[in-house]
């Protein structure tokens, strides 16, 4: 029997949950949202949510434990992305960029340098707010990926 991938979402700060649900429904894929108890809600609308301790990296650890080769991951966390890519998953950013293993070293280095700059008091702007166009682009990219898989 062929493995049917699931979509795992690093849900604490994910701005495209609605788009993920739409794509999952279209392709009949299971979605699992993983978030800390800080984001707990009794109103999950029948969705599959896993809530974890509020400790640093708790959601990441849970995602690493339940991810399987071939699963689709949505996260902004480059460190988590690099680990899950090594497990044979497909990792997308919240903006629909498909991370590639050969890019991870450079991306992790840039993240490290930015963290050092922040420690020195140099603050950079955060990411721009998600627009409707960004949401549409995310949905288009993940849909195209699944159609070609």
Curated annotation (Swiss-Prot):
Q: Fetch the InterPro entries from UniProt.
A: UPF0178
Q: Which domain of life is it from?
A: Bacteria
Record Pfam families: DUF188
Family indicated by similarity? Belongs to the UPF0178 family.
The identity of this protein, by name, is UPF0178 protein lwe1471
State the organism named in the record.
Answer: Listeria welshimeri serovar 6b (strain ATCC 35897 / DSM 20650 / CCUG 15529 / CIP 8149 / NCTC 11857 / SLCC 5334 / V8)
Lineage of the source organism?
Bacteria, Bacillati, Bacillota, Bacilli, Bacillales
């Amino acid at each position: 029997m062929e493995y049917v991938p699931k979509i795992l979402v690093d849900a604490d700060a994910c701005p495209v949950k609605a788009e993920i649900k739409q794509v999952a429904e279209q392709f009949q894929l299971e979605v699992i949202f993983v978030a800390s108890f800080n984001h707990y809600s009794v109103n999950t609308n029948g969705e599959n949510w896993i809530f974890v301790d509020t400790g640093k990296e708790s959601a990441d650890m849970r995602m690493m434990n339940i991810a399987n080769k071939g699963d689709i991951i949505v996260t902004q966390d480059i460190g988590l992305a690099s680990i899950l890519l090594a497990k044979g998953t497909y990792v997308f950013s919240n903006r629909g960029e498909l991370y590639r293993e050969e890019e991870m070293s450079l991306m992790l280095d840039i993240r490290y340098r930015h963290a050092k700059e922040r420690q020195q008091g140099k603050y950079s702007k955060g990411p721009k707010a998600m627009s409707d166009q960004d949401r549409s682009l995310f949905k288009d990219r993940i849909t195209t990926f699944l159609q070609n898989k």
